[in-house]
Regions:
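Short, basic/hydrophobic alpha-helical segments
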Residues: 1-11, 24-25
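Short, conserved catalytic/metal-binding motifs centered on acidic residues
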Residues: 9-20, 35, 216-220, 253
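A short acidic (Asp/Glu
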Residues: 20-28, 46-51
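A short alpha/beta connector and helix-capping loop motif
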Residues: 23-40
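Catalytic or ion-translocation cores adjacent to nucleophile or general acid/base/metal-coordination motifs
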Residues: 35-52
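Short amphipathic alpha-helical "interface-anchor" segments enriched in bulky aromatics
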Residues: 53-139, 190-237
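Long, low-complexity, polar/charged, intrinsically disordered or flexibly structured peripheral segments
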Residues: 116-199
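Basic, amphipathic alpha-helical segments enriched in Lys/Arg and hydrophobic/aromatic residues
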Residues: 208-291
Length: 295
């Protein structure tokens, strides 16, 4: 059954070894997934939009950890590294509290999205060597009522009780400030970091990532168990690719059957993601800061 055009894309959770590979984001996008990943500590994760040509406007949105924000969020991005392991926050004094407070300041400035990343190839320059560009429709957060901004006068009325943005520039400086919605073209560096599903740094992203990675390691341990999958190594088969491929396929099938049998035999258990969220909320004494709607 084909999925609807506007259905949520399935998540693909990978470790940092894949996220740094050339064209990784392009492959994930073209296969119809939304990446969920972290970045090496040494990697630059804050990128401004492309510098405008003389006399033209800059797009404005700044990319922070793979997601786009209002230009006013740039000073906040420099205060704290957000994409981190939960154990790191646990080891810090009031680490969960500090992280939640940082999200309460930053997430309202998240740009709205009226589309997924769209692949664009110029008709005039189309050739086998043509490198496609990727674009996305972004909406000012003040237009969506998540913040109030003097550059969007209507937001002062509609979002009177929301956090206030105090820009030090005029609306003509950025396209995202002079217009309500823009179509932004990713720069090459922005595209390498892009994540269009969960917002990196958010509680949802951190909890899901660690749960998915934990489940992956659990499945690998089952595959490595000779008692469950019946396979220990590939040394006894002809060292030819077709035969090895068949053995690996049977290995995975046997593992899947073992997982299914184990699942049927056990009683239903509560979601580990929900349990972790409740645990964090008990630690904070209040609900976690959640990612605001972007559409």
């Amino acid at each position: 059954v084909g999925k609807k055009a506007n259905a949520r894309l399935p998540y693909l959770c990978v470790d940092m070894g894949y996220s740094v590979r050339p064209d990784f984001t392009t492959v994930v996008h073209d296969q119809g997934f939304a990446p969920v990943m972290r970045y090496p500590v040494s990697r630059q994760t804050v990128w401004a939009s492309e510098k405008p040509e003389f006399g033209s406007q800059s797009p404005g949105p700044v990319q922070i950890n793979g997601a786009f924000y209002c230009p006013a969020a740039l000073p906040l991005a420099r205060q704290r590294r957000l994409v981190r392991r939960l154990n790191e926050l646990l080891d810090e004094q009031d680490g969960f509290e500090a992280h939640d407070q940082a999200l309460r300041k930053l997430l309202p400035l998240l740009m709205g999205t009226n589309s997924r990343p769209l692949k664009f190839v110029s008709k005039r320059k189309r050739s086998p060597e043509t490198i496609p560009t990727y674009q996305i429709d972004l909406v000012c957060p003040a237009v969506q009522g998540r913040v109030k901004c003097p550059l969007k006068p209507e937001s002062l009325i509609i979002a009177f009780d929301q956090p206030e943005v105090k820009p030090t520039w005029s609306a003509e400086r950025y396209r995202c400030c002079s217009k309500s919605q823009i179509r932004h073209t990713y720069t090459s560096e922005q595209w390498k970091l892009a994540q269009w599903g969960m917002v990196p740094g958010s509680w949802e992203h951190a909890i899901y990532y660690e749960a998915a990675r934990s489940l992956t390691e659990q499945r690998f341990s089952i595959m490595k168990s000779q008692h469950l999958s019946g396979r220990e190594h590939l040394k006894w088969s002809p060292r030819r690719e077709p035969m090895i491929s068949v053995i690996i396929a049977l290995w995975i099938a046997a593992t899947n059957l073992a997982i299914q049998d184990s699942h049927v035999a056990k009683k239903p258990r509560p979601s580990s993601i929900k349990k972790q969220k409740r645990r964090l909320e008990r630690d904070l004494g209040r609900p976690l800061m959640s990612t605001p709607p972007r559409t």
